[in-house]
Amino acid sequence: MSAEVISAPLTPVEKWLDGAALSSIYSSSYWNDIEEEKSKEWWIADGSTAAFARLEAYLERSGLMQSYRIAEKFLAGLAERDLLVADLAAGIGWTACLLSKLPNVSSVHAVDISEHRLEQLFPQAIRMFDGVAGKLKRSLGSFYDLRIADASVDVVFIAAAFHHAANPLRLLSEIDRVLSPGGHLILAAENVVSVAAVVRRMIRKLLHERKLCTNFYELFPPDDILGDHYYRVSDYYFFSQLLGYEVLNFVVTRPQTATVILRKSVS
């Protein structure tokens, strides 16, 4: 990586979507609600030390950073150099910034549907995490419709966002399109519903509704507001089989949080 690239300034946000197209995306109004965002731990727009400390504490407390470190250790150990990474639903860009610091990563393309996160918070995240601005690219767009060439990305990284996909199979199909043969899909800090959680909800439903329910999707329906899905370990393995990907690592870091690393077939 040349010194010119490393020292290059952050380029403007590339806008794949106009206002009308953005507003048509399910849940985009929630992710673009600035007033709502101001109450969140990741609101670091003022660039203050207090804001950074609050975000850092949240990332540690929530297990997000622990999950990210598992993914980072894996990526840092890859023999491949000049990796091209797509960070989907990148949010404020904390993962993209950390990924940009890895010596074997040449660029990180951060995609999100939240304009203020990309425009206002992302530059502050670069400061906070010492991100390499010259390696970073930001695009306002949907992860269902990536303006990225076929088989051109070495790593697709998604942190705590895969479950937000109202149509997970459509998202996986788009990921498979842009991921190069032998490339890796990393799902960090994703929800994984334990057997104990299923049993507890079955008992609760039995007690309150006098109904014995064994249907997982009835016990854990998608969230009404965001469309969030809930997944079991078996669901992630089903997704991998559907894609024909190999499961390289599946680490449950907390009772309901997992890091999943998949590899696409080379053929």
What name fits each language-model region?
Residues F157:
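A conserved beta-strand element that flanks and buttresses the S-adenosyl-L-methionine
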Residues S48-S67:
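Class I SAM-dependent methyltransferase Rossmann-like catalytic core
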Residues G182-E190:
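Conserved beta-strand signature within the Rossmann-like core of class I S-adenosyl-L-methionine
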Residues N191-L243, N249-V252:
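C-terminal alpha-helical "lid/dimerization" subdomain adjacent to the S-adenosyl-L-methionine
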Residues L169-P181:
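A short glycine-rich, Lys/Arg-flanked "PGG" loop and its adjoining helix->strand segment in the class I
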Residues I92-D145:
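Class I SAM-dependent methyltransferase SAM/SAH-binding core
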Residues M1-A53:
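N-terminal, positively charged/glycine-rich alpha-helical extensions of SAM-dependent methyltransferases
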Residues R61-R81:
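Conserved alpha-helix/loop element of class I SAM-dependent methyltransferases that forms part
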